[in-house]
C-alpha cells in the first residue's frame, strides 16, 4: 500500500466534435508518441466511414462496440505455497472501459485494410454486432476465468 495520499483522477475534457468523454478517452488510447492530431484524424475518419458506409450513428456504434467488448471477469496470478494459480476476479468499471478500448485498438491494428481509419471502422462495426477480434479476446478472457473458477476462493 502506498503511504502517500491517493492521487485524484484527472478530468478528461470531452472531445470537440461529439462532446463525449469516452471518445476523448479513445482518442488518447489510439494516440502514439503524443501525436493527438493524428489520433483525432484516425478516430474521426473511422467515424465518418461508419456513418457513410453503414449509414449508422457513429457514436451509437462506438458505444455499443465498447459495451460489447467490456470484460466482466479476468484472471490474476496468485502465488500460494509454491504454486501460481490463475484466480478469477471481477473487473472494476474503469478498467473494463480501458481494457475494451485497448482491445479494440489492438484488433484494429492487426486487420488487413489499408488505413488505420478503415481498420478501426471495420473493427468497431464488427464489435457492435458482437463479432471481430476484440470480441474473440473478451471471450478468451472469460473462458480462462470460467476454467479457473475452482480457484476463486483465493480472493485478493
UniProtKB/Swiss-Prot annotation:
Gene Ontology CC annotations of this record: small ribosomal subunit
InterPro entries tied to this protein: Ribosomal_uS7, Ribosomal_uS7_bac/org-type, Ribosomal_uS7_CS, Ribosomal_uS7_dom, Ribosomal_uS7_dom_sf
Ranges in coiled-coil conformation: none
Cited Pfam families: Ribosomal_S7
Keyword rRNA-binding: yes
GO biological process: translation
Top-rank lineage group of the source organism: Bacteria
Keywords from the UniProt entry: Ribonucleoprotein, Ribosomal protein, RNA-binding, rRNA-binding, tRNA-binding
Gene Ontology molecular-function annotations: rRNA binding; structural constituent of ribosome; tRNA binding
SUPFAM superfamilies assigned to the protein according to its UniProt record, in alphabetical order: Ribosomal protein S7
Segments crossing the lipid bilayer: none
Sequence similarity: Belongs to the universal ribosomal protein uS7 family.
Assembly information from the UniProt record: Part of the 30S ribosomal subunit. Contacts proteins S9 and S11.
Alphabetized PANTHER family for the sequence: RIBOSOMAL PROTEIN S7
Protein role: One of the primary rRNA binding proteins, it binds directly to 16S rRNA where it nucleates assembly of the head domain of the 30S subunit. Is located at the subunit interface close to the decoding center, probably blocks exit of the E-site tRNA.
Listed name of the protein: Small ribosomal subunit protein uS7
Lineage of the organism: Bacteria, Pseudomonadati, Pseudomonadota, Betaproteobacteria, Rhodocyclales
Amino acid at each position: 500500500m502506498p503511504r502517500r495520499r491517493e492521487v485524484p483522477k484527472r478530468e478528461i475534457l470531452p472531445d470537440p466534435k461529439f462532446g463525449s468523454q469516452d471518445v476523448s478517452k479513445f482518442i488518447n488510447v489510439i494516440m502514439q508518441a503524443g501525436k493527438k492530431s493524428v489520433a483525432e484524424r484516425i478516430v474521426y475518419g473511422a467515424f465518418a466511414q461508419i456513418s457513410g458506409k453503414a449509414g449508422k450513428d457513429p457514436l451509437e456504434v462506438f458505444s455499443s462496440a465498447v459495451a460489447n467488448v467490456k470484460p466482466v471477469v479476468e484472471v490474476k496470478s496468485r502465488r500460494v505455497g509454491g504454486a501460481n494459480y490463475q484466480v478469477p476476479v471481477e473487473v472494476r468499471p474503469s478498467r473494463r472501459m480501458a481494457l475494451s478500448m485497448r482491445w479494440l485498438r489492438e484488433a484494429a491494428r492487426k486487420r488487413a485494410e489499408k488505413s488505420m481509419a478503415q481498420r478501426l471502422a471495420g473493427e468497431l462495426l464488427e464489435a457492435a454486432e458482437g463479432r471481430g477480434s476484440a470480441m474473440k479476446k473478451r471471450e478468451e478472457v472469460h473462458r480462462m476465468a470460467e476454467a479457473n473458477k475452482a480457484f476463486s476462493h483465493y480472493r485478493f
